[in-house]
Structure formats: structure tokens, C-alpha cells
């Protein structure tokens, strides 16, 4: 009986990590709508990183990744979708923040936090890695200096 329960729990845990992206409609900074279940990177892994303009750890993480992003792209082809959860009254702060930091990510807006809530995410930064088949293979909440190295290692492992 214990073995059956353990097997069920392990199967459930694996299925949570290998889930597909939910269908939520977000907007680009130019106002175009995009459904999250259509996000892709031409069969290569991609990262979804939830942030807010007021979140200092989020900004530190995205700055740290920005320093190595071009190298990551050349090596692995990885793409990053940075998803702002700033509420409607703060959305106008996103574009200047992105511009001031020189982030080259595809920026998406989730002012109601619906996309983040779909993952039961409450704390940001909240980061997902999605494999080339569109399956979520990694989830992480929070940021400590140097944690971006773990992200690229996980992406590299997907390409082996």
C-alpha cells in the first residue's frame, strides 16, 4: 500500500513539472494580445521570468541574466519571456524600466497576475524553464546572486 501511494505521489509530482503552459491572454508592451499557450522558441527551450517594477530581487535577476543573455542565446538558442505582473496603475512604468536596464527580452504584461496564479505562484521573481516540446520542466521562486548559473545549466541539460 505504501509503495502504491508513493508511486502515485511521484507520478503526480512529475506531471506537475511536465505540464503544458496554460492558456492566458497577455499583452505585449505594444498592446498586441498573445496567448501564453502559444509561446515557443522554435523547438528550443525558453525561460519565463515573472517580475514587477517594484521588485528589487526581480530587477537584480533580470540584470544579471542580461549580462550573459547574448552568450546564452549563441550557445543554446534559449529565449526569455519576462512577464510583468505590475497592476494596471503601474503598467506605464514597465517600458521605461526595461529601456533603462537595456533588457533585450520579450516583455509581456500580466496586470491581473492570472498567468502567475496559474502556476500557484505568489512570490516573485518566479521562473519557469519550458523545454522545446512546450513542457514546463523547472519552476523556481526567489533569487540569490549567482542563481542565473543554475538556470543556464538546466537549459544546457535539456539540449544534451
Model segments located where?
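A short beta-strand-turn-helix
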Residues: 25-46
Amino acid at each position: 500500500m505504501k509503495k502504491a501511494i508513493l508511486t502515485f505521489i511521484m507520478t503526480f509530482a512529475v506531471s506537475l513539472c511536465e505540464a503544458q503552459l496554460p492558456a492566458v491572454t497577455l499583452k505585449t508592451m505594444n498592446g498586441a494580445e498573445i496567448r501564453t499557450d502559444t509561446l515557443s522558441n522554435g523547438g528550443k527551450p525558453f525561460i519565463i521570468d515573472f517580475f514587477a517594477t517594484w521588485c528589487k530581487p526581480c530587477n537584480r535577476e533580470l540584470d544579471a541574466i542580461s549580462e550573459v543573455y547574448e552568450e546564452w542565446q549563441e550557445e543554446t538558442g534559449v529565449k526569455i519571456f519576462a512577464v510583468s505582473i505590475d497592476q494596471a496603475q503601474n503598467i506605464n512604468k514597465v517600458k521605461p524600466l526595461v529601456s533603462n536596464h537595456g533588457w533585450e527580452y520579450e516583455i509581456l504584461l500580466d496586470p491581473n497576475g492570472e498567468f502567475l496564479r496559474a502556476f500557484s505562484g505568489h512570490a516573485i521573481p518566479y521562473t519557469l524553464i519550458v523545454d522545446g516540446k512546450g513542457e514546463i520542466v523547472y519552476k523556481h521562486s526567489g533569487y540569490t546572486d549567482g542563481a542565473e548559473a543554475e538556470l543556464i545549466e538546466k537549459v544546457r541539460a535539456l539540449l544534451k
